[in-house]
Amino acid sequence: MNQRTGILLVNLGTPKTPRPKDVYRYLNEFLTDGRVIDLPWLKRQLLVRCIIVPFRYKQSSMLYQKLWTAEGSPLLVHGIAVQTKLQMILGESFQVELAMRYQNPSIEEGLERLKLANVKEIVIFPLFPQYASATTGSVHQEVMKHLQQWQNIPTLTFINSYPDHPGLVGAFCERAKQYDLSIYDYFLFSFHGLPERQIRKGDSTGKCLTENCCQVICSDNAFCYKAQCYRTAKAIASKLRIKLEQYTVCFQSRLGKETWIQPYTSDLLKDCLAKNRKKILVFCPAFVCDCLETTCEVSIEYAEEFKHLGGDTLHLVEGLNSHPVWIEAIKTIIQEHLPHPHSQFSR
């Protein structure tokens, strides 16, 4: 039997259930990651375990209860669907596994299943289109933590980012077909935020967050999360023929009092109303699966706030989830990153 290529799809993670104790456990694991809150170990542990989680887990539990479906966590449900559909189109030459950076199924479990399958190479595919140390970087670090214990380490391919890949862009544009773009006054491309400090930390040039430094990606800012977000938004807007003056890139999900990358989505909603833009369509291209940040934060909380302040409508473009166009995009991205042609792709 020919050895197969292993594909490990990795997303952020989800609590086992929306119950407070499970949310508590999830938040502790997530927020004590040194790449997520990059403070010295003791300070991070005290901040997370004694302040952030004890004060947030019950509120987060209530949000997860709104998000949860009869099938379970949407992030996990959609993830399993992506895994299943990708396996079907890739065929027996590949083994596709799903893992979560935090909680289950874990990265260690996914790697062990690939090891048992005796795969000759492994492709690590983080489900984060834009690179950030707190997401993709953390995934790669966790993968190496476990692989370094293996006697025989297979050929590894790490996919770092794909912010303007035609497949990703095409999939979001396919989702946008559900909406009549002509009825909206303005468009927001809302990405998950990061502390400014983390963005600067990855910069070796001293130019980070200076005027227009994120508008074009070059060798100096190739790993800049904010620059990659602008690149994603520009590609989607261009394909949908949304003009530059019709949209803004913004950032959501801020945690704590530290300055995060701006503009903040919540502030832009108020700015839209001040400019009489009352019908808004929001894209969230940092999230390929609908989750707490899209379904609850944008589609419920921001939409309610916008209407309360005098807006007419705020609609969210549905996530890619397990849409067939997205599955094909994943296949293409994998194909482009494999170190050699694969018979499955040459048919």
UniProtKB/Swiss-Prot annotation:
Gene3D superfamilies: 3.40.50.1400. It comes from the Bacteria. It catalyses: heme b + 2 H(+) = protoporphyrin IX + Fe(2+). Keywords: Cytoplasm, Heme biosynthesis, Iron, Lyase, Metal-binding, Porphyrin biosynthesis. GO terms for molecular function: ferrochelatase activity; metal ion binding. GO terms for biological process: heme biosynthetic process. GO terms for cellular component: cytoplasm. It is found in: Cytoplasm. The keyword Signal does not apply. Its main location: cytoplasm. Its EC number is 4.98.1.1. Pathway: Porphyrin-containing compound metabolism; protoheme biosynthesis; protoheme from protoporphyrin-IX: step 1/1. Fe cation binds at residues 192, 293. Catalyzes the ferrous insertion into protoporphyrin IX. HAMAP family: Ferrochelatase. Belongs to the ferrochelatase family. This is Ferrochelatase. It comes from Protochlamydia amoebophila (strain UWE25).
